[in-house]
């Protein structure tokens, strides 16, 4: 029996709702597979913890998390806590402290979900966005001077290192190489940002020589938004900076139908530390407690987590079950359905328990 220790951090807003749904689905997979078990410990860190303790997580938070095989994260952010405190107090310290430098965000149109793009269905939009997750625009460097005075100045410094760019570029090329189309698009803004972004272009050209079977091209980030919208079939694997990929992946989720179906994995490819898996969507306080949060993104990131742990059959079974459920029209309101979170979760669990899930071809 293979055993895994998972740290669950539901955090804020709808985070606890979707993480509860994800844990229910993981339990269903355990029962269906019968050859692995997941032991979960839940941490109450987040905005409520901050209001009580003045910090988003304890000082030894990272040390507590080191013993786990993976981290299952909900969402962070609250209306009465500044966003920079919630982000820099919890999620970013985990990503940077554990050197989770590869943020991997798959996007595709799931069967049964109608995307906003005309003539775009399952198979037409099937991307993976690789986001540099350790430096760049979110390096945290900069400052403010003369605060409150007319001459106040604020600086936000983007840092790009050769080692950081090279390793994310190599990761993206390897991922593209493993996908059927072997196609990579490198996104920068090197016409206007003539230092760090030009270095990105140069390193991409250098690394590409290691992958002669991968076809690659370059796009400026503004032009990339147009291409994603008008020619989604022309894209496959995409790599971009911390900020650019953050923005593009939200656009990708919307183009696929909803951020409620968009997952993300914060990966330490060298496996020195636990990697973290989360839905892209935020804490969504406007629907918190209503029971209508879309759990599909959390199920998808749970599949990413299972694959990272080596449980590829379980990951495939989970995504097959999800696609059967969406195809059947069991959908939450954000994607045009009337089902609630629990109904979608129960349907996925029932699909997992059904026979021959692995042998059923996923639609799309």
Curated annotation (Swiss-Prot):
Task: Give the organism the record lists.
Answer: Agrobacterium vitis (Rhizobium vitis)
| A molecular function GO annotation | tartrate dehydrogenase activity
Give the protein's biological function.
Has multiple catalytic activities. Apart from catalyzing the oxidation of (+)-tartrate to oxaloglycolate, also converts meso-tartrate to D-glycerate and catalyzes the oxidative decarboxylation of D-malate to pyruvate.
The record's annotation in SMART domains points to: Iso_dh
The record's section on Pfam families has:
Iso_dh
Family of this protein: Belongs to the isocitrate and isopropylmalate dehydrogenases family.
Main location group: cytoplasm
Q: Which SUPFAM superfamilies match?
A: Isocitrate/Isopropylmalate dehydrogenase-like (SSF53659)
Q: What is its EC number?
A: 1.1.1.93, 4.1.1.73, 1.1.1.83
Q: Which residues bind Mn(2+)?
A: 222, 246, 250
- Which Gene3D superfamilies does the entry link to? Isopropylmalate Dehydrogenase
Entry protein name:
Probable tartrate dehydrogenase/decarboxylase TtuC
Q: Where in the cell is it found?
A: Cytoplasm
- Tell me the InterPro entries matching this sequence: ICDH/IPMDH, IsoCit/isopropylmalate_DH_CS, IsoPropMal-DH-like_dom, TTC_DH
Q: Which reaction does it catalyse?
A: tartrate + NAD(+) = 2-hydroxy-3-oxosuccinate + NADH + H(+); (2R,3S)-tartrate + NAD(+) = 2-hydroxy-3-oxosuccinate + NADH + H(+); (2R,3R)-tartrate + NAD(+) = 2-hydroxy-3-oxosuccinate + NADH + H(+); (2R,3R)-tartrate + H(+) = (R)-glycerate + CO2
Q: What induces it?
A: By tartrate.
Q: One GO cellular component term, please give it.
A: cytoplasm
Q: Which residues form the signal peptide?
A: none
Q: Pathway listed for it?
A: Carbohydrate acid metabolism; tartrate degradation; 2-hydroxy-3-oxosuccinate from L-tartrate: step 1/1; Carbohydrate acid metabolism; tartrate degradation; 2-hydroxy-3-oxosuccinate from meso-tartrate: step 1/1; Carbohydrate acid metabolism; tartrate degradation; D-glycerate from L-tartrate: step 1/1
């Amino acid at each position: 029996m293979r055993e895994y220790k998972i740290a669950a951090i539901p955090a804020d807003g709808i985070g606890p709702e979707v993480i509860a749904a994800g844990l229910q689905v993981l339990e269903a997979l355990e029962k269906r597979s019968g050859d692995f078990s997941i032991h979960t410990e839940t941490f109450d860190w987040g905005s409520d913890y901050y209001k009580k303790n003045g910090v988003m997580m304890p000082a030894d938070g990272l040390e507590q998390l080191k013993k786990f095989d993976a981290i299952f994260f909900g969402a962070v952010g609250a209306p009465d806590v500044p966003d920079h405190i919630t982000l820099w107090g919890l999620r970013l310290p985990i990503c940077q402290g554990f050197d989770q430098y590869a943020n991997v965000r798959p996007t595709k149109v799931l069967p049964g979900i109608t995307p906003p793009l005309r003539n775009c269905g399952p198979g037409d939009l099937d991307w993976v966005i690789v986001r540099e997750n350790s430096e760049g625009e979110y390096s945290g460097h900069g400052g403010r001077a003369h605060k409150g005075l007319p001459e106040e100045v604020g600086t936000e410094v983007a840092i790009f290192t050769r080692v950081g760019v090279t390793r994310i570029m190599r990761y993206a090329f390897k991922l593209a190489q493993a996908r059927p189309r072997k196609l990579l698009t490198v996104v920068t803004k090197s016409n206007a940002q003539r230092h760090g972004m030009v270095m990105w272009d140069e390193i991409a050209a250098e690394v590409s020589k290691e992958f002669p079977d991968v076809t690659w091209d370059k796009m400026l980030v503004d032009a990339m938004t147009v291409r994603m919208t008008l020619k989604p079939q022309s894209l496959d694997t995409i790599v971009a900076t911390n900020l650019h990929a953050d923005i593009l992946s939200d656009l990708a989720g919307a183009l696929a139908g909803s951020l409620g179906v968009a997952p993300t994995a914060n990966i330490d490819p060298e496996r020195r530390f636990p990697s973290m898996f989360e839905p892209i969507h935020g804490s969504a306080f406007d629907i918190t407690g209503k029971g209508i949060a879309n759990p599909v993104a959390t199920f998808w990131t749970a599949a990413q987590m299972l694959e990272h742990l080596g449980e590829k059959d379980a990951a495939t079974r989970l995504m097959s079950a999800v696609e059967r459920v969406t195809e059947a029209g069991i959908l939450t309101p954000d994607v045009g359905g009337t089902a609630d979170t629990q109904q979608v979760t129960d349907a996925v669990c029932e699909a997992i328990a059904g026979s021959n899930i692995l042998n059923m071809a996923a639609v799309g």
